[in-house]
Regions:
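Alpha-helical recognition domains of nuclear gene-regulatory proteins
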Residues: 29-30, 55-62, 79-82, 90, ...
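A short, hydrophobic beta-strand/beta-hairpin element that forms part of a small beta-sheet core
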Residues: 68, 78, 88-108
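Short coil/turn segments at secondary-structure boundaries
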Residues: 32-33, 42-43, 51-54, 81-85, ...
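N-terminal leader/targeting and pre-domain segments
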Residues: 1-34, 114-152
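Eukaryotic basic, amphipathic alpha-helical target segments in cytosolic regions
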Residues: 35, 60-67, 87, 107, ...
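Thiol-based oxidoreductase modules, predominantly thioredoxin-like and allied folds used
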Residues: 18-23, 41-45, 53, 57-78
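Hydrophobic beta-strand anchors of alpha/beta hydrolase catalytic cores
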Residues: 38-39, 91
Length: 152
């Protein structure tokens, strides 16, 4: 499929934004209709989940190749139990309707909770969920330029 038609197809399937999944029917529909789905499990009061949603909103707009959704784990006990979600936030990476990776908490990004959109993007790129990681590449380049300025 040509890139333009593929982007239109992705957009019609909800790609390009972070959507809330409210029930298991929606969850399984999203998983079935998109090749790559990145699911954030959190709850409304979780501050780290809120930060993650902000980063994922940015990434969803930049990466049409994956569908980004979030689930309130407290309101979706069936899905949460089925996927063995035991820590919030948790990111579940689904490819071809199968769980490929699961990241419990923030330790794989940055245990302090202070991470950039680029760091999350890089993790998802390494997982094979995103085709490239331009935000991460830009952040690394900016750091290298800052270090070069300090050394001069």
């Amino acid at each position: 499929m040509p890139p333009r038609r593929r982007s239109q197809s992705w957009a019609s399937n909800g790609h390009g934004q972070l959507d809330k999944i409210v029930d298991q029917k929606d969850f399984f529909g999203v998983s079935k209709n998109s090749k790559k789905v990145i699911v954030l499990f959190t709850r409304d009061g979780n501050k780290y989940g809120q930060i993650m949603k902000e980063h994922m909103t940015v990434l969803a707009q930049q990466h049409m190749e994956a569908r980004f959704v979030w689930v309130d784990a407290e309101k979706a006990p069936f899905i949460t139990e089925k996927l063995n979600i035991w820590m919030l936030p948790t990111i579940v990476c689904i490819v071809d309707n199968q769980v490929k990776d699961q990241h419990n908490g923030l330790n794989e990004i940055d245990g302090s909770g202070k991470y950039t959109t680029g760091m999350l993007e890089y993790l998802l790129h390494v997982d094979g969920m995103l085709d490239e990681a331009p935000s991460y590449d830009r952040e690394i380049q900016e750091e290298e330029e800052e270090l070069a300025d300090i050394e001069d």
